[in-house]
Amino acid sequence: MKQYNDLFKIIHREGYIFIASFALVSFLLASFNEKLGCMGFIATAWCIYFFRNPDRFVPIGNDLVISPADGVIQEIKEALPPAELGLGDVEMIRVSIFLNIFNVHVNRIPANGKILALHYNPGKFFNASLDKASVYNERQSVLMETEQGQKIAFVQIAGLIARRIVCDLEESNEVKAGERYGIIRFGSRVDVYLPLKTALLVSKGQTAIGGETIIADFGRKKTAELQFERK
């Protein structure tokens, strides 16, 4: 029984219906046409791959902000946080992480703390790599206060293909960095909003691993933006 439980743990529950449907159709196709059946099983395997839900080695530290998603850090800029979270007109550092269809799409809590507010905003489905996606696309915004008293926000943004955002959080939840809290289906983006004086530990173009990559450290003084060299 434990083996079956472990098997289900490595696949996010949002994928169960898709995987079962793909598998059923594949068996039906295989009974009529071997090539079509083979294509169906390949699609089923891809579906399992997309909804994979791997464990991660989460860095420990109350001052740390961990990447909430797998993907490429597409942009780091100063921007206004989502108005619905009530953070006012003061700009924050926005770290945007773009997920393609091959990335793990399970999202994780970026820091230890408490959830203060949640807001779902229906919207468009522009390509998530575009800057305007942060403003116009369907999104789920979350405001939290870290254990060190810092207010940060993180936002799940639907993309061109994505059509469903899942967020399992509720207001007043006590959360830990690296905990799974949701998923965005089929291509998307996650934005993290941090206070302006936050010391960042990542750079544009870097690949982030959700639940593992440290994107900021409140315990450090802010310095010039880090520079990285490809080798």
From Swiss-Prot:
Cleavage (non-hydrolytic) (site feature) positions: 187-188
The protein's required cofactors: pyruvate
UniProt keyword Membrane, yes or no: yes
Gene Ontology process terms (BP): phosphatidylethanolamine biosynthetic process
Record PTM text: Is synthesized initially as an inactive proenzyme. Formation of the active enzyme involves a self-maturation process in which the active site pyruvoyl group is generated from an internal serine residue via an autocatalytic post-translational modification. Two non-identical subunits are generated from the proenzyme in this reaction, and the pyruvate is formed at the N-terminus of the alpha chain, which is derived from the carboxyl end of the proenzyme.
Catalysis: reaction(s): a 1,2-diacyl-sn-glycero-3-phospho-L-serine + H(+) = a 1,2-diacyl-sn-glycero-3-phosphoethanolamine + CO2
Bound cofactor: record note: Binds 1 pyruvoyl group covalently per subunit.
Pathway of action: Phospholipid metabolism; phosphatidylethanolamine biosynthesis; phosphatidylethanolamine from CDP-diacylglycerol: step 2/2
Description of how the protein assembles with itself and partners: Heterodimer of a large membrane-associated beta subunit and a small pyruvoyl-containing alpha subunit.
Record-listed E.C. numbers: 4.1.1.65
Recorded family membership: Belongs to the phosphatidylserine decarboxylase family. PSD-A subfamily.
Keyword Lipid biosynthesis: yes
Keywords, sorted A to Z: Cell membrane, Decarboxylase, Lipid biosynthesis, Lipid metabolism, Lyase, Membrane, Phospholipid biosynthesis, Phospholipid metabolism, Pyruvate, Zymogen
Residue list for modification Pyruvic acid (Ser): 188
Entries under Pfam families matching the protein: PS_Dcarbxylase
The organism's place on the tree of life at top rank: Bacteria
GO MF annotation: an example: phosphatidylserine decarboxylase activity
Protein name: Phosphatidylserine decarboxylase proenzyme
CC per GO annotation: plasma membrane
